[in-house]
């Protein structure tokens, strides 16, 4: 691994510090909880929409989320390692055949829908078993501290 890649990995680990970024791709519907500063206080605002693109790599990686707000299309670009992002949650997986879904900008209503990627029962069972196992391990590790 070259020096720049090592430094980027180190910085990414420092920026994440306890946060986990789920695996998501264009076509997935995500909820991004963003920290918004209003005067003295800070609050968390949820922004839900379809991820239409992922750009860059390493620390500069970003993604674009599009939603329809009061009949008007709104797009917002987020840096993955931004300290302003509180959390990212994947609501549903989309089945698409493109990396950039910019064609959704021209579509309205039913033509802008994205088919949901269905998970096989076996894959779902293994995912849930891993989730339970991780939860149990976390629960067992907590009293030891």
UniProtKB/Swiss-Prot annotation:
GO terms for biological process: translation. Disulfide bonds: none annotated. Residues 114-145 are annotated as: Disordered. PROSITE patterns: RIBOSOMAL_L19 (PS01015). GO terms for molecular function: structural constituent of ribosome. GO terms for cellular component: cytosolic large ribosomal subunit. Keywords: Ribonucleoprotein, Ribosomal protein. Residues 114-136 have a biased composition (Basic and acidic residues). It comes from the Bacteria. Belongs to the bacterial ribosomal protein bL19 family. This protein is located at the 30S-50S ribosomal subunit interface and may play a role in the structure and function of the aminoacyl-tRNA binding site. NCBIfam families: rplS_bact. This is Large ribosomal subunit protein bL19. It comes from Methylocella silvestris (strain DSM 15510 / CIP 108128 / LMG 27833 / NCIMB 13906 / BL2).
